């Protein structure tokens, strides 16, 4: 690591300084208020389209600055309170005066016309990441900052990495044309067209260019000061629009960054009379994924305000606290994006209570947030190639399949890691009992071979829908690459309701083996709803159990004619195999993961969870008897097991008041090298009775209001 402070979890705020804030900015009061909020890291925009210090460079300084060196004032004040100062910059926008001097720095459309940032701004152009503005000129900006201020880090805004900013499309400037020609031997595509095979090649170039861009920025900072940490701002797959248009591969980018920051800002995006809510578990998703694929310090940025569009109003404290707590429950650190001025002058100060409460809790108990690692033995796989090249017209469906798994496991309290398909190697898979493939369609032969060997060595695999049916470039194969492993061959992909004929229809999964463990706790029913598409498959080999088959579809209306006399066609919808090694495989021919996220019928979540429990042979490290709205994660330290409890039961969002979770039972399964001797909650440190169970120890927690951590402390000789 580049600096000692990166070795510990942080409690951050990011401040976007507006022009008008410079008029009466009180740096000393800012530092004091942040200290009172238990903040130990502040990043703040100081250079770019708004610069808040005197400069000899062609940067736009705030008209309200009045000759002040606000950057210097902030850094000095922060250090007086022991807060780290990270200077952030965003050179994605070029002021008109600078663009006039260097028109070659602008990003161009196919007609050679420059892209303008939001036209109402009027005098800003969008910079190409390959241009001199974000390269040679950036070096001068950086040199000025590093030589002048005692900074603890440099952070580059999101516009510094990706190839889209403020709505621009493909850049046709000379540097982009030359770079793409050298990469592919082709000219740039004429338009964005996900169905065009050439688009895939273009996206691969952009992905490589973004990684190279990340490497360049890292080296640039280190050339100025080898010990100065570099932070980024990007996003994981949970925002597919930004990920795809920006060609962002955060896993590879993280290799060239000291501290990785990704965003989970959006709560609900309101546009006119329409509103779209973001996934409530998005904070967990991002922290979980990045801590699984990177050994860098992980920051996840969430808005203080109600994004989007209300930058001035705070997220209600009840929701904010449990939203931010998810970062810490999954190994990350929270950084709150503050817009609208420093805390003392903010128009809505109601949200600061949540930050003070959570950050104070983390600070008081910081030893339990250091040196921890995930205790999960189930891995859910994300595939960058599947997002980019599989369902190109609706990539959100793939993300929703992953999130359906996340939602099911969260509701049933199954600890899991989100890993990349690049981790499908013997070394990385060794720590997992079960690997889950939610429609991991684009799969390499190397990954498939690793999974086969994994099962041969006793591991288990759960897969859904078109997993392994496509190559890494999105070309459809004749059969599943995992056909032998899963025991099925692909025949066709169809709607569960059959061909479209104008009749509103329904279809079901018929229960065929009601006593199979995969159908445990299903209750007194012989049918389960079937939704979306499915793969018609043929069984391969013997010794496969088929607990569910697809019914014939039939009409919904009129009710008196809503039935079918057609026989069950017998298409397998759930296929389970036990392998000689002791490993198990489960294949869902349909899309229960996607359906569970979008429509929420509980049977789908139960089936997915049963699949993991059965595949894992009952060897999950933790079991919880708790409401489905209590998020439970497991972290490990050398002599502790840490069960993070995040209560997400606040009724209708945005949460105004949390409904406490009560009478929770946590069973920690026995480990050969760890013997619990004491259990307590970090909120009060009072010891809780340990009850010996057949395969571990259990504890009862009477109440969780919003966020707490249950600590199992081991014997002194536990290792």
Residues covered by each model-derived region:
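Short acidic/polar active-site loop segments enriched in Thr and Asp
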Residues: 39-41, 152, 333-334, 433
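Glycine-rich, aromatic-flanked loop segments that form ligand/cofactor-binding clefts
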Residues: 12, 39-44, 70-119, 153-158, ...
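Short, acidic/polar
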Residues: 20-36, 134-145, 242-253, 316-324, ...
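Short, solvent-exposed turn/loop segments enriched in Gly/Ser/Thr/Pro and often Arg
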Residues: 16, 43-50, 89-96, 155-167, ...
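Carbohydrate-binding surfaces of carbohydrate-active enzymes
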Residues: 2, 7-9, 85, 199-200, ...
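Aromatic-lined carbohydrate-binding/catalytic grooves of carbohydrate-active enzymes
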Residues: 30, 35-70, 93-111, 163-175, ...
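Active-site-adjacent "subsite" loops/lids of carbohydrate-active enzymes
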Residues: 87, 91-149, 158, 174-207, ...
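Mature N-terminal, pre-catalytic/accessory segment of carbohydrate-active enzymes
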Residues: 1-52, 56-88, 374, 631, ...
